[in-house]
Amino acid sequence: MSDGSDDDTNNDGNYCKNVSYNFLIQRLAEVSNRKCLLLPKKKNRVDYISIMQTAEFYPELVNSSPPLEPGFTSCEVFVVDKKVDKDTLHLDNFSPYHIGATRRTLERQHSYFYRVNESGNFVPAIKTNGTHILRILVSILGSCPALNRKIYRMVKIESQNKNCLPSLIVYTFEPGHEIPKPNAPAILRRQTSDEIQKILNIPGTSFSQAHSEAVLNRFYDDLPIRDEASDQKRARYSIESTSSTNNQLNEINSFVVPKFEGRQESEQLFRDVKVEQFEESAEISINNRALSPHIQPSKTSVVNRPNQQNRKFQNYDMFSAGVISTATVPAPMFHPHITPIADLKDDDGYDPEELTQRNKLASLYRLVDLFRWSQGIYNHITVRVSTDPDEILINAFGQLYSEVSASSLIKVDLDGTVIDGGSTNFGVNQAGYVLHSAIHNGRPEVKCVVHLHHPSVVAVSAQKCGLLPISQESMIVGDVGYHEYRGILIDEAERALLVRDLGDRNVMILRNHGFVVCGESIEHALSLTYHLIIACETQIRTVPGGNTDNVHFPAQSAIKQVYKVASQGGGGVNRQNGHVNSMQWKKGELEWQAYMRQLDAQGYVTGNVPN
């Protein structure tokens, strides 16, 4: 099931001030000894904000304390007095959600900026001109992913600890699933994986076509269509759903709302969007701005046009890249045809930190391609946006890694909503969204996540012994987690399993699939990826069949010493001024700068600022 903060498929940017009181009072019932609004289906942010505003004037809808348990129906909305603080709101019989260091739920928080217009309606805003923040805390019980709880709080920016409207506690429960017991252990143990798969309808090896299409359609229906004219005001866009979606919503639930009078103001703030019909293949087209013809100046000269011999070599390399590596130690093989990486200008409207991240992430995609680790348009790498921890940058699904540039990267939040569609007409890989959103949400300290299918790592992932500490590179990588293969990663319910299996490690091997690397920076992620691949290539040459009878294993003290030393900047061995002075370099930064110098020398225009 989706654990996004809401389903904004019917959001046109106009927020009505009041929901019909008659509509709400007809759905008022008693659940868990509390007043509850029983709705046939979960709503979107528009509707929830309207309920909060209406409840402000009708105290008979408001509870003085949160419920202890849900009633396990499709959608239950508990309105709670605005005087109840945020710490009290999340307490129920399934709390505490964290006991000691054990994570008992998958949790995430989302923040949306608004301002109040002259008609008293909330309209979306950017951080610079917003006056209010809608805080949404999403919690999914690990032992029962069918149970979803969201807490909605509207606060003013200047007093974020004080609610300005009644809060909402929304429980949604998918019928047909077993009702969880209060305080049931939420850790998904391996011995219960078969039961979890049965509950979630996850086949053992692959997904049925109907199930896969349903998941894809649900994901793509949540994606906003990007306006072609949003180059100067990227944060100002609206979402219009297809007519079929609107008809369906009107049949299921009809909020009786007064006509919005501030339409003219809304039209000035939010541009109209051209809606494209969704095809049965679940593909989506995102209207984007054209690729900027401007690039950042480079101090290096662009390489000359390649001759015919080089072109033939590149064609061969393109088809073999990432499939078979003949090098003992991976080394970049540079292409004669070069697309500049840093193709955005400083005045394109991006935050300087995000612009640097875009250049770095695009450079990492190029390095992965040049190392011959890529597989066409597949696999994915993400980085958390420094200005908003709930947003990540990812490649456009349809581009080769040799085509990725700063402008083509897509910015998406952890709910799957596209914030900036980049310079292409491509969308986001659903498997990439499921994997990366889970890790970025479960591990807030992780900044960069790399997922690749390198053949050597896949070979080790298929060995029962897993990664062995038989090379220095494997010791540098450190402790590794393992995730069992359950088919292509398109089911969002598998995110809790991914977070559990990763734990606090930086590397996770996906059985019969590939690997995931988590870095505290882009540079760190590349360094870990590099050493993991070398370690796996060494292992499949040493123990191709997994027989370790004739293998020498180093002492545990040596293994720990290698990891401790290598975990420092400069690999822990950078000697300067008569002593080891590695701390001036962050993890992976020393070799990253070397790669950037080489890329710029070849004319890739990385936009890198040398240290």
Swiss-Prot record:
SMART domains: Aldolase_II (SM01007). InterPro entries: Aldolase-II_Adducin_sf, Aldolase_II/adducin_N, Aldolase_II/adducin_N_sf. Disulfide bonds: none annotated. It is found in: Cytoplasm, Cytoskeleton; Cell membrane. Keywords: Actin-binding, Cell membrane, Cytoplasm, Cytoskeleton, Membrane. It is a peripheral membrane protein. One of its GO terms (cellular component) is plasma membrane. Its main location: cytoplasm. GO terms for molecular function: actin filament binding. PANTHER family: ADDUCIN, ADDUCIN-RELATED PROTEIN 2. Membrane-cytoskeleton-associated protein that promotes the assembly of the spectrin-actin network. Belongs to the aldolase class II family. Adducin subfamily. This is Adducin-related protein 2.
